[in-house]
Amino acid sequence: MGPALAHLDIDQQRFAWIPEDDFVNHFAADLDPVKARVMFAVQQPLPWSALGEVMGVPAWKSLPTWFLVADGDQAIPPAAQRQFAPRMGATTVEVSTNHVAMVSHPDEVLRLIKTGAEAVAAAT
């Protein structure tokens, strides 16, 4: 895990929360700080167990896959993302962004989603 997740607050119900400083400066580092603070204020916790549980058979084993590598991600290291994508056989794009690419680079994310949707539609 990267610095965005280095200081998680785990509550009594075993939910993980990202502290404000880490959220603004690492998790959503390429956003305007005001927008990042709004996102921090409305964040939903992640069950702590989710970071270590095996979730069953991954869909990428049987379905076409597209993957966006966020080369400035401070939550999931970009090197790990670059390793995951080929293992999945994913069509991959790399964007200079942080973990919240869907907010900071919505056009690039939309383009990747459209590419995947069009490829699947053409194959059926």
Regions found by a protein language model. Give the residues of each.
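Helix-loop "lid/cap" segments that line or gate small-molecule binding pockets
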Residues: 20-30
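Short, amphipathic alpha-helical "lid/cap" segments that border enzyme active or binding sites
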Residues: 106-114
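Short beta-strand/loop motif that positions the catalytic acidic residue
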Residues: 61, 66-69
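Active-site nucleophile elbow and catalytic-triad environment of alpha/beta-hydrolase enzymes
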Residues: 38-59
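Conserved loop-alpha-helix segment in the C-terminal half of the alpha/beta-hydrolase fold
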Residues: 71-97, 103, 115-116
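Short, hydrophobic alpha-helical segments
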Residues: 113-124
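Flexible "cap/lid" loop of the alpha/beta hydrolase fold
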Residues: 1-20, 47-50, 54, 76, ...
